[in-house]
């Protein structure tokens, strides 16, 4: 709710800006930026919004292995439902009704954590790695209960498929 209030307040500042285009500096819109990623960071990666150049501390990070880039594949959503000291629960959903999607989940924002196991629909699988792959059928979702050891690996910017 706080994030939505901030967006509304920022947009009101834009609408009531008394300056004219010919007197406005090029960076004038910066104080009015309505982007508010806090809730998205908390709900998708289980982290806190980084402030003032600080690194992102998060439980997971997502990659699109087909596009070879960081981030979610098109049409895939994630919701972190629960965080414990050594585990988390996240639900992934593929909103595309006709195409499947693959997602790589990394342990931490920089692979600093280690996945030890995952439970999906009651089936448990041991992992022992900094990432895991999930295949989502068209229009399907999955709730993953992931066990992890936190801050046991040296952080890296390398993509999961380059390690």
Give the positions of each predicted feature.
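A short, polar/proline- and glycine-enriched secondary-structure boundary/capping micro-motif
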Residues: 101-102, 154-156
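Surface-exposed beta-strand/loop patches in extracellular or lumenal glycoproteins
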Residues: 96-111
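Glycine/proline-rich low-complexity spacer/linker segments in large multi-domain proteins
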Residues: 155-163
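Solvent-exposed residues in well-ordered beta-strands and their adjoining turns
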Residues: 93, 108, 147-149
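Catalytic domains of carbohydrate-active enzymes that cleave complex glycans
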Residues: 1-89, 95-98, 144
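Intrinsically disordered, low-complexity Pro/Gly/Ser/Thr-rich segments with frequent PxxP/GP/PP motifs
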Residues: 116-153
């Amino acid at each position: 709710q706080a994030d939505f209030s901030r967006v509304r307040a920022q947009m009101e500042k834009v609408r009531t800006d008394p300056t004219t285009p010919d007197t406005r500096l090029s960076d004038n819109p910066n104080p009015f930026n309505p982007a508010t990623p806090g809730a998205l960071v908390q709900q998708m990666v289980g982290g806190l919004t980084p402030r003032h150049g600080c690194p992102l501390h998060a439980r997971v990070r997502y990659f699109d292995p087909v596009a070879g880039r960081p981030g979610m594949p098109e049409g895939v959503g994630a919701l972190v439902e629960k965080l414990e000291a050594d585990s988390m629960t996240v639900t992934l959903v593929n909103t595309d009704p006709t195409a499947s999607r693959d997602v790589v989940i990394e342990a931490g924002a920089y692979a600093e954590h280690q996945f030890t196991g995952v439970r999906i629909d009651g089936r448990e699988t041991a992992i022992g790695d900094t990432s895991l792959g999930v295949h989502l059928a068209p229009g399907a979702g999955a709730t993953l209960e992931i066990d992890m050891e936190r801050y046991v690996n040296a952080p890296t910017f390398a993509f999961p498929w380059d390690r």
